Amino acid sequence: MRHSLSDLSPRQMWLLILLVIAALLAGLGLREPMPADEPRFVLAAKTMVETGQWLFPQRGIELYAEKPPTFMWLQAASYVLVRSWDVAFLLPSLLAALLTLWLTGDLARRLWGKRTADYAVLGLFVCLQFVLQAKRAQIDMVLVGMTTLSLW
């Protein structure tokens, strides 16, 4: 007997969705930024919040023009919302991962149907690098989310 994600009841599907979200949320707020990139991004975001200078990211007093500022803006905005750097520095990557999963599912559903959409989301979620980047404070996951949004 063949089973597919389409055979799941709505309750089971919601349980699966909650399980995916819980897996991505696991450990949020339990670690400090890790070298090499994460501390630099957090320092630039902290400087934005402390000085009110959001247009040109800085690390301390030095202009930080090595990377696009979007990720640091998102980290700083996350801090304004949650008031905890332990959570705020990882929140943009987590939200971008959830957005990417949703956009992938919606696009696949529109193009090929619900069954294919379910497998597309599951296939993306079980990719190790996708989950690792969703739990890192690096630009990559936000770039993936924005690229997926542009294709959607």
What residue ranges belong to the model's regions?
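Membrane-integral, polyisoprenol-dependent glycosyltransferases
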Residues: 2-152
